[in-house]
Amino acid sequence: QPRSRGLGDVYKRQAVYGNPQRSATGFDLRRMNMLLAVLEKRVGFKLAQKDVFLNIAGGLKVNDPAIDLAVISAILSSNMDASIEPEVCMAGEIGLSGEIRPVNRIEQRIGEAEKLGFKRILLPKHNLQGIDTKKIKIELVPVRKVEEAFRTLFG
């Protein structure tokens, strides 16, 4: 059962044969493998023996590292069979040590999230510096590490 809310699909299966399959359509496979390694090391999810298929909907190819946080959240959601609240969105680049790095054009991203009706946005804590929060209606949820984002999304 995919967990995507129409934004793409992530499927996970237990591999009962040889090496697990990894597939990414519209997203860099090497980057996905790096994100899977970070999930194993920092959050403790054992994904080494599971198949992971990632598909970005609509035939889009996404190279923006700001999608990293959304990708790992979708993978975790599928692995745990737990939904992410539909009014939550996120932006953040993930580093090798699990840190959530700042992204470009954060105010523009926040504005677009508001226009699309999102109520909360997870974003890198470092991106809060210099943002005029008085005009922002969406709840800003700053996170520093992957583990923190995981706790925020899944309790």
Where are these regions (language model features)?
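Short, small-residue-biased leader/transition segments that mark boundaries at the very start
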Residues: Q1-V10
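Peripheral, non-AAA+ core regions of ATP-driven protein-machinery
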Residues: D9-G155
